[in-house]
Design a protein with these regions (language model features):
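Surface-exposed patches in mature extracellular/periplasmic domains of secreted proteins
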Residues: 69-72, 85, 114, 141-152, ...
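Hydrophobic membrane-insertion alpha-helices, especially the h-region
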Residues: 9-25
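Short, Lys/Arg-rich N-terminal segment immediately upstream of the first membrane anchor
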Residues: 1-7
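Cell-wall polysaccharide-cleaving catalytic domain and substrate-binding groove, primarily
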Residues: 77-95, 101, 133, 156, ...
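Second-shell loop/turn segments in exported
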Residues: 40-47, 57-61, 83-92, 112-124, ...
Length: 211
């Protein structure tokens, strides 16, 4: 075995050990280091990609009297600003809309209902329909705060109304989720989504404070 090959094998072994250690060692959030590095890179890249779309986000949000930073936060949570994404449940594009919600939004805007490929690849239309859908959630349930709107955007208005009715109110449903979390049980993914989106919204507010 020549020296170059021995060096290569040693490097491969070292890399394998580093990856293994990366999965065994956890960060302060309890994530394996390897996973933390990948996730943090994806998040920061998403902030940059969504930020590059700020002019379009600002104009689309303005049409629906929405906070553009909130819309940017949703885009970050849904697609990380990457075009052409399809979720496991069939949600499409930058704002991750299902066809039924997109068709309803298009009807409210006086537009033709988009087909699958149009909704997936027409970023401007996807953004406009996503903003209209968010505005519809806001207007149809005015008592909801930003967190509740985001939960509904993620899981569906009907489902959140059902959860709130079962708990007695939205606030009581949130309280029940926090009790679960305190007891070491998983919190609703939709509530986690909403709270992370609000944190990202705040980051965009700081970044584009002058707009």
């Amino acid at each position: 075995m020549n020296s170059a090959r021995r060096v290569l094998i040693r490097l491969l072994i070292l890399c394998s050990l580093l990856v293994a250690v990366g999965w065994l060692v956890h960060d302060d959030q309890g994530r394996p280091i390897v996973r933390a590095i990948v996730e943090d890179y994806s998040k920061q890249r998403g902030i940059r990609l969504v930020g590059e779309r700020w002019p379009a986000i600002f104009e689309a949000a303005k049409q629906e009297d929405l906070d553009p930073s909130l819309v940017a936060g949703i885009m970050w949570s849904e697609s990380r600003g990457v075009s052409g994404r399809v979720s496991s449940v069939g949600a499409l594009g930058l704002m991750q809309l299902v066809l039924t919600a997109a068709s309803d939004a298009a009807e409210r805007l006086g537009l033709e209902a988009p087909d699958h490929d149009t909704l997936l690849h027409d970023d401007a239309l996807n953004l406009a329909l996503g903003c209209n859908h968010l505005a519809w959630l806001r207007d149809s349930t005015p008592e909801w705060n930003a967190e509740a709107l985001l939960v509904a955007y993620n899981t569906g208005r009907g489902r959140l109304l059902e959860w709130s009715q079962e708990a007695g109110s939205y606030q009581l449903w949130v309280a029940s989720q926090e009790v679960r979390h305190a007891a070491g049980r998983p919190m609703s993914p939709a509530l986690i989504y909403a709270r992370e989106t609000l944190r990202v919204r705040n980051a965009f507010r700081e970044q584009f404070a002058g707009d």
